[in-house]
UniProtKB/Swiss-Prot annotation:
Belongs to the GcvT family. It catalyses: N(6)-[(R)-S(8)-aminomethyldihydrolipoyl]-L-lysyl-[protein] + (6S)-5,6,7,8-tetrahydrofolate = N(6)-[(R)-dihydrolipoyl]-L-lysyl-[protein] + (6R)-5,10-methylene-5,6,7,8-tetrahydrofolate + NH4(+). It comes from Listeria monocytogenes serotype 4b (strain F2365). The gene is gcvT. GO terms for molecular function: aminomethyltransferase activity; transaminase activity. The keyword Transferase applies. This is Aminomethyltransferase. The lineage of its organism: Bacteria, Bacillati, Bacillota, Bacilli, Bacillales.
Length: 362
């Protein structure tokens, strides 16, 4: 059996009562105090996530921008230095290699932050499709990454840094920012639907920053609450809402797919065809009317006919209802449409509802 990978924060998990699981080959905390309490901490105050398992890929060179324009669906030329952009990497078929965030450090240097389980696959795909004068380097092992999320995130982080955090706009970032005596990159971003920051630092210093933030009275948060938070906010998870068989258009990520950008990109032709022909299926929100929790890969029925599958589901700690995302036949995606979810050989009533399930007050 292959030994599980560990983040630089791993030695501290036991001290804070973490219960760990195998997550894509990594030994990561599923919870600390408990999923519901952790979820509520992030929605009402703040919580700290160890996301050091995420991958970082450095792209450098005079042709970096044109290379990324070819590789990614969003318009890279629109990113200013010091800003980040959500992006999708597609196959020729229009299916998804990964979803990721691109940070623009300079006109010739970018960092791509990718899903942990996809890091090697993404890196190989990027190298295989290299064009122009660029270098592509997997620098994942050099970085620790923490996410401080919640309405109190700015107030808490302000105690540990001299950076004027209020000047960092959403998806903006600052380099060489001192946090608890460590040089970091602070990005105003996250995966929870709340305000917050993602902080990148050298791996060796990650534990120091982690403990300095927790010392401010912040709760450590595990993967369980990370999933319920992102699901309420309807943020896609690769392997569930996106995959090699699911295009970003089917997943409702049109805002990150710029079919009109001049640059050709991998998958552009297939995505244009799909859009012109009309989508056969699309991602919708569902809420269960009867008791039961929808889970990944559960079938969705209408009048005995299978019309789709659940991609993600949970009991929503914020709403107190059982919710899910489902990829279903476009003909049946109207709000209010009643469907059934197959749960343990029973068909449980559900209805299609507007998304996101949760949106924070600005």
């Amino acid at each position: 059996m292959t030994e599980l990978l560990k983040t630089p924060i791993h030695p501290l998990y036991a001290k804070y009562g973490a219960k760990t699981i195998d997550f894509g080959g990594w030994d990561l905390p599923v919870q600390f105090a408990g999923i519901k309490a952790e979820h509520e901490a992030v929605r009402t105050d703040a919580g700290l996530f160890d996301v050091s398992h995420m991958g970082e890929i450095l792209v450098k060179g005079p042709d970096s921008t044109s290379y990324l324009q070819y590789l990614l669906t969003n318009d890279i030329e629109k990113i200013k230095i010091g800003k980040a952009q959500y992006n999708i990497m597609c196959y020729e078929t229009g299916g998804t290699v990964d979803d990721l965030v691109v940070y623009k450090k300079s006109e010739t240097e970018y960092i791509l932050v990718v899903n942990a389980a996809n890091t090697d696959k993404d890196f190989e795909w990027m190298v295989k499709n290299i064009r122009g004068d660029v270098s592509v380097t997997n620098v994942s092992s050099e970085y620790g990454q923490l996410a401080l999320q919640g309405p109190s995130a700015e107030k808490i982080l302000a105690k540990l840094t001299d950076v004027d955090l209020s000047s960092i706009s959403f998806f903006g970032f600052v380099e060489d920012a001192d946090v608890a005596g460590v040089k970091t990159i602070i990005s105003r971003s996250g995966y929870t639907g709340e305000d917050g920051f993602e902080i990148y630092m050298p791996s060796a210093d990650a534990g120091k920053v982690f403990e300095a933030i927790l010392a401010e009275g912040v709760a450590p948060i595990g993967l369980g609450a990370r999933d319920t938070l992102r699901l309420e906010a309807v943020l896609a998870l690769y392997g569930q809402e996106l995959s090699k068989d699911i295009t970003p258009l089917e997943a409702g990520l049109n805002f990150a797919v710029k079919l009109k950008k001049e640059a050709d990109f991998i998958g552009k032709e297939a995505l244009i065809k799909q859009k012109e022909a009309g989508l056969n299926r699309k991602l919708v929100g569902i809420e269960l009317i009867e008791r039961g929790i929808p889970r990944h890969d559960y079938p969705v029925f209408l009048n005995e006919e299978e019309i789709g599958i659940v991609t993600s589901g949970t009991q929503s700690p914020t709403l107190g209802t059982n919710i899910g995302l489902a990829l279903i036949d476009t003909a049946y995606t109207e709000i209010g449409q009643e469907v059934e979810v197959g749960i343990r050989n029973k068909k449980i009533k559900a209805k299609i509802v507007p998304t996101p399930f949760y949106k924070r007050a600005k």
